């Protein structure tokens, strides 16, 4: 066998360069498209001692108890981003306290977001008329079940939302969402 000198070895041709460029571009796009899919299946990191998720406001900022209480009056129910990114109502119990539970705002009938009607003191679904009392218990269908609950904990002024797995205090039954 004869040795080929370095100057006789042909350089990368245009076709090979274009193949490498195409492969790199397709690989980059595929990885970019797969990232959100893979991220969906990875559970969020636990925060706080209770293992909850940090509550976030409508802009995606962490909710602080002091800021929330300064902007919301007693009896107010306002939305935050809770577990799994679901809209969750934080309840202001008093001038200086956030309730120890939150109410998931997803209607149990068809999944619409249920707004709080302060005048009627209940949640009223705009899609098909289901109604829930101030604690999220269904009072008028077609929704078959009460709204899901979540624990709310305040630690070092940060608000955390965690899974509710105990008995539902509204129905004295096991929670359907756990």
Swiss-Prot record:
It is found in: Cellular thylakoid membrane. Pfam families: Rieske, TM_PetC. GO terms for biological process: photosynthesis. Keywords: 2Fe-2S, Disulfide bond, Electron transport, Iron, Iron-sulfur, Membrane, Metal-binding, Thylakoid, Translocase, Transmembrane, Transmembrane helix, Transport. [2Fe-2S] cluster binds at residues 107, 109, 125, 128. It catalyses: 2 oxidized [plastocyanin] + a plastoquinol + 2 H(+)(in) = 2 reduced [plastocyanin] + a plastoquinone + 4 H(+)(out). Its main location: membrane. It is an enzyme of class 7 (translocase). The keyword Metal-binding applies. Its cofactor is [2Fe-2S] cluster. The 4 large subunits of the cytochrome b6-f complex are cytochrome b6, subunit IV (17 kDa polypeptide, PetD), cytochrome f and the Rieske protein, while the 4 small subunits are PetG, PetL, PetM and PetN. The complex functions as a dimer. This is Cytochrome b6-f complex iron-sulfur subunit.
């Amino acid at each position: 066998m004869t040795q080929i000198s370095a100057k006789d070895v042909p350089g990368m041709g245009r076709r090979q360069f274009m193949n490498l460029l195409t492969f790199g571009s397709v690989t980059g796009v595929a990885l970019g498209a797969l990232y959100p899919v893979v991220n969906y299946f990875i559970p969020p990191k636990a925060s706080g001692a209770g293992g909850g998720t940090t509550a976030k406001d409508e802009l995606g900022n962490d909710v602080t108890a002091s800021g929330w209480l300064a902007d919301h009056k007693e009896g107010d129910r306002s939305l935050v981003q809770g577990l799994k990114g679901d809209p969750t109502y934080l309840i202001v119990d008093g001038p200086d306290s956030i309730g120890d539970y939150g109410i998931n705002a997803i209607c149990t009938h068809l999944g619409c977001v249920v707004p709080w009607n302060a005048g009627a003191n209940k949640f009223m679904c705009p899609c098909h008329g289901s109604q829930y009392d101030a604690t999220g218990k269904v009072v008028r269908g077609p929704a078959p079940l009460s709204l899901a609950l979540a624990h709310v904990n305040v630690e070092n002024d940060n608000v955390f939302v965690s899974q509710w797995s105990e008995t539902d205090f509204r129905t004295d039954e096991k929670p359907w969402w756990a």
